[in-house]
């Protein structure tokens, strides 16, 4: 066989193998019954010459079955678009902007949730025997698989994007407003569509990752655009726990401090008589009259500086109405409030059938008078005063007792009858004899003058009264 014939057969064999490998859709079945289909889009361009294949294009389909212990959920509602094939013998040119999308499978021990309502892009492939020019710069997507033990949330409503093919070398704007995994997915990536790239959402969360919300107005999908091939990295793995992203309005409205002036309004209703119903706020008559007075005051003071009326009360004297009016501080005074009320008294007479007189307005510091509580009863106050008086008297008595005790220690003793016996006749005492003695403090010795001689004058120290002696002799 000549070299020319060998090269022709080699070219036909190579073309057949290349068409079978890249043109047919491969589907792999897992033990759980999961089926995943990758769709590769190709464009047909007219060509009349046969070119030598410079580089081989391989669509890497990463199809790995999960190991033992893995739980794979069967896909639901997966629909494939019809495949359109050109006629046999037509010259099909493979586009230079071909992107292969990886098929991601969970690692052993991972749990994959079902993908619902997934629509794949239409498959357009040439027939066998067609002549294809060489394809340059074809990039195969890497194999992305989730981490061991990770759990992927279900993907709902993922629809492939249409085939938009800009001119070679042009820059396609990114596609925004992409929402993946029903608005919240962990590490989800949305594939941007450029130069005939089929969009496929792949969710590859890391182990024990926390899902966070992805706003619809932001997309973080990296996109690489080249003149020969387009590679879309449609998977991202988060290896850290991400806290939930929350959007809150931190704007705070400034708080306005408003000064308030209070006025005490009192007037008489002469055409009404006070009765017991006006003493009970639960009666209908009390409530109706209070409502009429409130409406009247609100109609009289319509300006924006008027804040309200409160504490409406009734007391005898025909009917005396007492209320408290609140205004913004510095906007009005007592005279203006009284004058404005007097101007609209006729409205009360015509509309509410009330004859108002003796209007008086006074300035008060607070809208409500401080109501004293139960307080201390009268007998309690009297008892408290009595206890205080008794305590004061006891203190005075103790002070006087202490003073007397101290003074007694500094005084001597006056002995009226210094003799040891209990009775002494008067004859034993001299005329000018003092009937006592003074004992100084802390002295125990008896005075020598208090000694009385025995035998009434038998001693040399005795004294005899001659007058008394003569009288006794005469008797």
Swiss-Prot record:
Keywords: Autocatalytic cleavage, Cell membrane, Cytoplasm, Glycoprotein, Lipoprotein, Membrane, Nucleus, Palmitate, Phosphoprotein, Repeat, Signal, Transmembrane, Transmembrane helix. A motif (Required for interaction with AP1S2) lies at residues 463-466. Its main location: membrane. Residues 453-461 are annotated as: Required for interaction with beta- and gamma-catenins. Residues 443-450 are annotated as: Required for interaction with GSK3B. Probably both N- and O-glycosylated (in repeat region). Proteolytic cleavage in the SEA domain occurs in the endoplasmic reticulum by an autoproteolytic mechanism and requires the full-length SEA domain as well as requiring a Ser, Thr or Cys residue at the P + 1 site. Ectodomain shedding is mediated by ADAM17 in uterine epithelial cells. Residues 1-23 form the signal peptide. The chain crosses the membrane at residues 381-401. GO terms for cellular component: apical plasma membrane; cytoplasm; nucleus. Residues 402-475 are cytoplasmic. Residues 412-448 are annotated as: Interaction with P53. This is Mucin-1. It comes from Hylobates lar. The gene is MUC1.
